Amino acid sequence: MPDMDRRTFLAGTAAATTATAVGASRAGAIVKSVSAQVDPRYRGKRHVAVLGGGCGGLSAAHELLERGFTVDVYERYPVAGGKCRSIPSEGTGTGGRADLPGEHGLRFFPGYYRHVIDTMARIPYGSNPNGVKDNLVFGSTARFSRKDALDVPFPYKKLNSVNVITDLPAALVGLLGVIPGLTPAELLYFATRLTEFVTSCDARRDAEYDTLSWWEFVQAERFGSLYQNLLTRSLTRNLVAAQAELASTRTIGLQATRILVANILFSMYDEASRLLNAPTSEVWIDPWLNHLRGAGVNWFPDTTVEGIELQGGAISGVRVSSGGPSRTITADVYVLAIPVEGARTLLGAPFRALDPALTALDDLMPDWMTGVQYFLSRRLPIARGHVTYVDSPWALTSVSQGQFWNRDLSTYGNGAVRDVVSVDVSNWDAPGILFGKPARQCTKDEIFKEIWEQMKISLNEDGVILRDGDIVDRFLDPAIKFGPAGTPVDNAEPLLVNTVDSWAKRPGATTRIPNLFLASDYVKTNTDLATMEGANEAARRAVNGILDLTGWSGSRARIWTFEEPALFAVARAEDRLRYVLGLPHKLSDRRR
């Protein structure tokens, strides 16, 4: 039974129930901001070194710059953006045209995103009244494509269909009932599991649901292949680009709550899915860096962090290299804004002795999830949004980008390109259908051919949609490194997966090393997902820690909580009582 005084709890439950009966409930993944202690050594200090120029690093620099801090940003690549950046396919531009725009993987901006959207609105872009934010366009439809079956369109439309809590399972059944082939029992069971999560308390989500995989939570093994592949795996990939068998129910449930329930059924947020209207670096990352540099940020590209030096329990300097001899850079405060696989290498035993929470970085799991782009000679708007290939062994998701871009694609490459289909590959370990090998054992050419074939068998059921002759060029994220045998040996930019039991292992943005702060997507945040939004929120938390440490008296960087429908506040308070009493959720059919 959870450790809490029941009398204290009951009084709090009654107050919470009354307070949240009207309006939106500020519930779900609320991470308390941990304040750094004002330290006389740092009071009034204003020089910050940001190590990493991806979304987290630039977000931290942005917030600090607006508060008058001197900011130096060090980035290992020649360009900013990290995994968000566009990656030109070198040498493909001819006749004065730009190189073809590749990328790490497709990206979209769900309606519940708040932190990164707020930052985008503060980045000037031409005459846009809302800056870079105005470069987002609505993706109105998801599509689930299946082998030997009709495709399923899933419109992102706002329904406003739930008036009382008992309506929720029926509303979810109606929402998902557009999928042919699922039995009423399967639909109802899945809807009931979603309802269970939506009406659960935060404590249960943190302690119980984080110990369950989404696959286990929805009891996928009890049902047929369509339930497993479409509702369990594909819906998960579409929402969060994660594998249902590995991902924490806490994480998947929160994203489903925000997108399917709060966004679509209750219309609490903006459009469910937004995409950029041109290659990412052109309409977001480059304008962002230009704005920051123009306002005074010092930018050091092609600079690798080799080590962090400690003295007296604090950071005294950072060893970096820009292709020549190592040098030591110094600042008052340091923000580590690199992915977890790099952070845990830099933050070794001396750091962990000062802050034991950093030891758990070793338990966080990055996985191979990366992208391929096919540059086509004709427009191919497969869906006005994401396409999930339900039966693809490599767990594919794609977007036809030309329909969203306001660019003339003939100005790239050799002039023959009219569309770009960007594909994410989420499973590098399952055998393919063309060569019978997992992606990790394929050559680059085999990877291109295998992905294309898996897409073809899902799309070319009622006519030819994908044609081999339409391919002008192809691009694979260069983070995939190939060895002498021609097969992948490393992924330099894997994606963190919120696996079972990972919530408690993720550190906060503030550490016990007074002048070290963390601003990356592995940090514990309300977002609870390795995304641009999560990195931006982590950066804001790091900045607020710096403001506390240095005695800053001005405004803090805003942190959003993600509101959930107030209709469920009473049910969630009831579940909090049940949780404290050691009882399961009243809708749960799992054995404890």
Name the predicted role of every residue range.
Residues 94-189:
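Dinucleotide-binding Rossmann-like beta1-alpha1 core, especially the glycine-rich loop
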Residues 309-328:
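Conserved beta-strand-loop-beta-strand element in the redox core of flavoprotein oxidoreductases
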Residues 189-307, 311:
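Active-site/ligand-binding neighborhood in enzyme catalytic cores
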Residues 1-16:
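N-terminal secretory signal peptides and thylakoid transit peptides that target proteins
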Residues 46-72:
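N-terminal Rossmann-like FAD-binding beta1-loop-alpha1 element of flavoenzymes
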Residues 66-87:
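Glycine-rich FAD pyrophosphate-binding loop
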Residues 547-591:
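Active-site-proximal substrate-binding core of FAD-dependent oxidoreductases
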